């Protein structure tokens, strides 16, 4: 029988989970991080410290549309696992495998290649400004006479 974590293929599936399932998912995610980092190395404590907030963010936002900008990539292992990279997480740090930091080349969910502290604020501001510049312009046909 698949674990709850193994049944998650897309982060939007988390939005349908109840509190008990979210708690179980966080625990399974935590165990996965411990399992892999004990063999492959990596950032254990910082990643374990962000499991619950990662689950909460994925429950409440749609990162196909919304953007998350992690300040430091070594806090994002749960995010990597829950955004479609669980099956490949065993390759953490290997050549051609999952990177230990966020990488826009690795996943469309990695919106910023975080690596160092205190870069998220300026990156998020830049993204916000760019989204403001890209206006959505509706081309209205004959519906204007009915409004």
Residue ranges: model-predicted function:
Residues 10-13, 34-42, 106-113:
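Glycine- and acidic
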Residues 17, 36-37, 56, 140:
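Compositionally biased, intrinsically disordered low-complexity segments
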Residues 1-36:
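Cofactor-/ligand-binding subdomain signature composed of acidic, glycine-rich
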Residues 43-147:
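Cofactor-binding active-site loop characterized by glycine-rich and histidine/acidic residues
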């Amino acid at each position: 029988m698949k674990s709850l974590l193994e049944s998650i293929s897309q982060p939007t599936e988390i939005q349908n989970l109840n509190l008990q399932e979210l708690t179980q998912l966080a625990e399974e995610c935590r165990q996965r991080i411990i399992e892999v980092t004990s063999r492959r190395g990596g950032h254990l404590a910082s990643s374990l410290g962000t499991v619950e907030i990662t689950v909460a963010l994925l429950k409440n936002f749609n990162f196909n549309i919304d953007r998350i900008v992690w300040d430091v990539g070594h806090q994002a292992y749960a995010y990597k696992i829950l955004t479609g990279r669980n099956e490949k997480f065993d390759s953490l740090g290997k050549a051609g495998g999952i990177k230990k930091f966020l990488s826009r080349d690795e996943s469309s969910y990695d919106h910023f290649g975080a690596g160092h502290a205190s870069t998220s604020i300026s990156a998020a501001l830049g993204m916000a400004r760019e989204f403001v510049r890209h206006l959505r312009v509706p081309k209205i046909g004959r519906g204007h006479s009915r409004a």
